[in-house]
UniProtKB/Swiss-Prot annotation:
Disulphide bridges, residue numbers: C161-C175
Residues reported to bind 4-aminobutanoate: E180, Y182, T227
Protein name from the UniProt record: Gamma-aminobutyric acid receptor subunit beta-3
CDD domains named in the record: LGIC_ECD_GABAAR_B, LGIC_TM_GABAAR_beta
């Protein structure tokens, strides 16, 4: 009886002790126990040699990488580069950092990264990079129970991007980000995209003012240098330039200025001030557009697509100015000179012919001009005018007589009158030639302007058709 009661009494008093012991044991292994976590971290870092890679002397460390792109801030044609902000994450396994008793991942302070081995990753085509430091340095260390380490950084990098601008601004560019190990060869480290094609995210969120991202590709390969073979990962973007900005800022103004230069074809040929001022203004405007465009592009040795177009527009504008110079030369220069030579040649021929007509004198000493002679001379004068406003010249077919003044019919006086007959007739013909020289031929001038109104627009339209078909396709 007493034995049974004593056992019950022992059980009653020993139960709280067992519960306390179990609770104490659980509290030691509780992840929320800061002292236990501290002891675990201290144990991991105690004796850890940062100078040696994981599995030193064994197989290479496999480092997986993920990139979450925050933004592409700028693509510069002048500097041949682009600026990228991203969350860069690296995964690898370090058995020295495996732990037990805590079934949770340990996210540690960013300063712990200075006490652990991390891959010597760098960006091959980097020009300038930095890790953000507001409010603290933007890097993260996370440990998994099996020893897997996550090392994350928020980085902004300006990477080189060699561009082919031959088709600018109707071009597509391919910009890459090259990731490589600086010191470890493939015997010590291997890189791979963690997650395959989904290793890079955030591309669909990117919006650029002048480009659209057509696609992105991931490449993994090894490159060989004199010091060995090194792992390399490549992220490439195919960027297609948006043409809308250039249509409004470059192409449309150039087209309108070229069309404006053709207005001179409808301005009267004798309005020299208006036509010259219009031609010079359009030429200078095209020069200004071309100069402004070149300031935004690098000094490259080859011709770009937009250079071809602006040069074509400049040629059309310059030819429109030269067209008036040619018209002006025809009207005031070559035309009178040509007609002067023609008149002198005609006058000489008629002078020779007049010598054979000295004897065409009637009984009273009058010079007889046949109606056909008068008709021919008046037609030459009227033909030289070429304008209906200046060609209203009429004549009488009944014949014209040039009567000499009454002279004494002595022998000496008659001899002097006969000798003056050819001189007076030559003077009449010379006056006709001078009239032809003073009035230039307007037919050629008007024809040049009329043809220019057709040829210039047609040729410019053909130029645009060939240009856009070639560069767009």
């Amino acid at each position: 009886m007493w034995g049974f009661a004593g056992g019950r009494l022992f059980g009653i008093f020993s139960a709280p002790v067992l519960v306390a012991v179990v609770c104490c044991a659980q509290s030691v292994n509780d992840p929320g126990n800061m002292s236990f976590v501290k002891e675990t971290v201290d144990k991991l870092l105690k004796g850890y040699d940062i100078r040696l890679r994981p599995d030193f002397g064994g197989p290479p460390v496999c480092v997986g990488m993920n990139i979450d792109i925050a933004s592409i801030d700028m693509v510069s044609e002048v500097n041949m580069d682009y600026t990228l902000t991203m969350y860069f994450q690296q995964y690898w396994r370090d058995k020295r950092l495996a732990y037990s008793g805590i079934p949770l991942n340990l996210t540690l302070d960013n300063r712990v990264a200075d006490q652990l081995w991390v891959p010597d990753t760098y960006f091959l085509n980097d020009k300038k990079s930095f890790v953000h430091g507001v409010t603290v340095k933007n890097r993260m260390i996370r440990l998994h129970p099996d020893g897997t380490v996550l090392y994350g950084l928020r980085i902004t990098t300006t990477a080189a991007c060699m561009m082919d601008l031959r088709r600018y601004p109707l071009d597509e560019q391919n910009c890459t980000l090259e990731i490589e190990s600086y010191g470890y060869t493939t015997d010590d480290i291997e890189f791979y995209w963690r997650g395959g094609d989904k290793a890079v995210t955030g591309v669909e969120r990117i919006e650029l003012p002048q480009f659209s991202i057509v696609e992105h590709r991931l490449v993994s390969r090894n490159v060989v240098f004199a010091t060995g073979a090194y792992p390399r990962l490549s992220l490439s973007f195919r960027l297609k330039r948006n043409i809308g900005y250039f249509i409004l800022q470059t192409y449309m103004p150039s087209i309108l200025i070229t069309i404006l230069s053709w207005v001179s074809f409808w301005i009267n040929y004798d309005a020299s001030a208006a036509r010259v001022a219009l031609g010079i203004t359009t030429v200078l405007t095209m020069t200004t557009i071309n100069t402004h465009l070149r300031e935004t592009l690098p000094k490259i040795p080859y011709v770009k697509a937009i250079d071809m177009y602006l040069m074509g527009c400049f040629v059309f504008v310059f030819l429109a100015l030269l067209e008036y110079a040619f018209v002006n030369y025809i009207f005031f220069g070559r035309g009178p000179q040509r007609q002067k030579k023609l008149a002198e040649k005609t006058a000489k021929a008629k002078n020779d012919r007049s010598k054979s007509e000295i004897n065409r004198v009637d009984a009273h000493g009058n010079i007889l001009l046949a109606p056909m002679d008068v008709h021919n001379e008046m037609n030459e004068v009227a033909g030289s005018v070429g304008d209906t406003r200046n060609s209203a010249i009429s004549f009488d077919n009944s014949g014209i007589q040039y009567r000499k003044q009454s002279m004494p019919k002595e022998g000496h006086g008659r001899y002097m009158g006969d000798r003056s007959i050819p001189h007076k007739k030559t003077h009449l013909r010379r006056r006709s030639s001078q009239l032809k020289i003073k009035i230039p031929d307007l037919t050629d001038v008007n024809a040049i302007d009329r043809w220019s109104r057709i040829v210039f627009p047609f040729t410019f339209s053909l130029f645009n058709l060939v240009y856009w078909l070639y560069y767009v396709n």
